[in-house]
């Protein structure tokens, strides 16, 4: 069944686009039937770390308060079950170590967790920009905090799987780069990931050509979603069991 009229009135986001790529049936449940999902371990962990960095960058928490706050709230807010006890312990320790030695680049902070509404690919979009900053030379950076352990670009003649994954996640920052230009009058000079679990900073120069490619990807994907009628489920064990927030309402989960 198609839901053209409902879909055409939507405000889009990077996560709304990638949810369809993850699983069309998940997208149907979440955005058409509005099933209230239940965040799982990885999502809860990412939300806690984002909240802590927001509070630190806005002066609500001091550096000395970060680890005690983190440990206290990890125990109370991370209620989802980790895939294994080893992963649970690893994530807890990686977060603790990161916050213990936290060090952001010395730049002027312009925006923190900035809610943006803008047009992209001919459609209304929204997004939350984790951090926008400017260095002493006036170069503008937009930064996204990521729990995923992305790797810096290899610069090999043939892109590695890690390079392909990096480009996939950079789509989000290119969407935000368009928003920054629309709202603040200039494109960022650099797109940046703060991969906090591994304490890895990945910085990529902005490319107008790449942004145009992302815009075309978004436009094509929205067209696909609008014309979708089958809404097939992508049954993949790890995703369904540990990442999908509507799995408990999904009749396909028992097939795994």
At which residue positions do the language-model features occur?
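RecB-family 4Fe-4S metal-dependent nuclease core
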Residues: 1-256
């Amino acid at each position: 069944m198609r839901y053209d009229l409902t879909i055409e009135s939507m405000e889009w986001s990077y996560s709304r686009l990638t949810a369809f790529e993850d699983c069309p049936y998940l997208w149907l449940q979440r955005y058409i039937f509005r099933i209230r999902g239940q965040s799982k371990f990885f999502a809860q962990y990412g939300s806690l770390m984002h909240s802590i960095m927001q509070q630190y960058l806005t002066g609500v928490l001091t550096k000395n308060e970060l680890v005690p706050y983190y440990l206290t709230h990890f125990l109370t807010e991370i209620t989802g079950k980790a895939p294994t006890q080893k992963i649970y312990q690893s994530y807890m320790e990686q977060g603790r170590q990161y916050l213990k030695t936290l060090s952001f680049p010395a730049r002027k902070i312009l925006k923190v967790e900035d809610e943006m509404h803008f047009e992209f690919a001919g459609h209304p979009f929204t997004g939350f920009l984790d951090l926008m900053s400017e260095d002493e030379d006036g170069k503008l950076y937009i930064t996204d905090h990521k729990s995923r352990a992305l790797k810096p670009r290899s610069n090999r003649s043939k892109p590695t799987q890690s390079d392909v994954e990096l480009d996939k996640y950079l789509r989000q920052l290119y969407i935000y780069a368009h928003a920054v230009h629309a709202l603040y009058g200039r494109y960022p000079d650099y797109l940046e990931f703060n991969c906090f679990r591994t304490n890895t900073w990945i910085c990529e120069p902005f490319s107008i050509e790449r942004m145009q490619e992302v815009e075309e990807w978004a436009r094509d994907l929205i067209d696909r979603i609008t014309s979708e009628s089958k809404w097939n489920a992508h049954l993949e064990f790890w995703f369904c069991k540990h990442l999908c927030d509507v799995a408990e309402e999904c009749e396909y989960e028992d097939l795994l």
